[in-house]
Amino acid sequence: MSGKFAGGKSYRARIAATGAGSLLALAVLAGCSTAPGPVAQPEPTVVAAEHTGQFLAELGLEGLDAKQAIDRLDRLPQEQRPENFTAQVQPTKLVLTDASGRTANLPLPEGQYYLSAAPYVDQTHSCHFHSLTTCLGQLQGAQVQVKAINADTGEVLVDKGMETFDNGFIGLWVPRGITLDLEFKYQGKTARTTASTAGQTSATCLTELQLV
C-alpha cells in the first residue's frame, strides 16, 4: 500500500504482520494492488478443490462462500484483521493466499460484483483489486450518502446513507457486466465517478474519490 495517513482521529495506523518477514512480504505483494500489468508473476501453489474446505478452516473461514467471506472480512475492526493470509477481491473471484504461498480461489456469486469505495478528503492511495486484509481508507466510521445508477438503463441500484467500515471503505454488491455512475456525499462535499463491472480486469477498489 502506498497510502499513509498520519494524525487525525479518523486514522489509526497499523502495520500488518509486524515482525514476520514472510507475512509482511505477502501483504506488500497482495495489498491494495495497482492495475494488472504484463509482468509475469510467480505461480502460486493452488489448493486442490478437495482440500479447499480444510484450507478455509485453517484461515478461520470454515463453511463460508466467497460472498460470506468478503462480507465478514471487510467489516472487521482493524485490530482483528488476520495477519496470516491475504484476501483479494477480483472481478469474478476471491483470492485467498496464506504466508506459505498456498492459494484458493472462491467464485463470486453468478452475476454479482463486489465494488469497494473509499471516498477521502485529503489522503488516499492507489488501488485496483481490493484487499480485505490490508487496504485502508482515510474515513473510518463515516456516514456517507451513496448513490449508484446503472448508466446503461438509468436504474437506481443504491440510494441510501451508509457507514464506512473500520478500514475506511464502503462495500457494494452490484450487477456484473454494467457501467455504474457513482456519487458519494459527506459533510457537504461530493465525489463522483464512473466504474465498469464488466471483464476480467476491471477494478474492484475505488480510491480516487476526493470529496470536494
Q: Locations of the language-model features?
A:
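C-terminal motif of bacterial Sec signal peptides marking the signal peptidase cleavage site
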Residues: 27-31
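Bacterial signal peptide processing site
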Residues: 33-36
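Mid-length scaffold segments of soluble, non-membrane domains
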Residues: 107-157
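Glycine-centered loop-to-beta-strand initiation motif
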Residues: 163-172, 182
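A short, solvent-exposed beta-strand micro-motif common in secreted/extracellular proteins
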Residues: 178-187
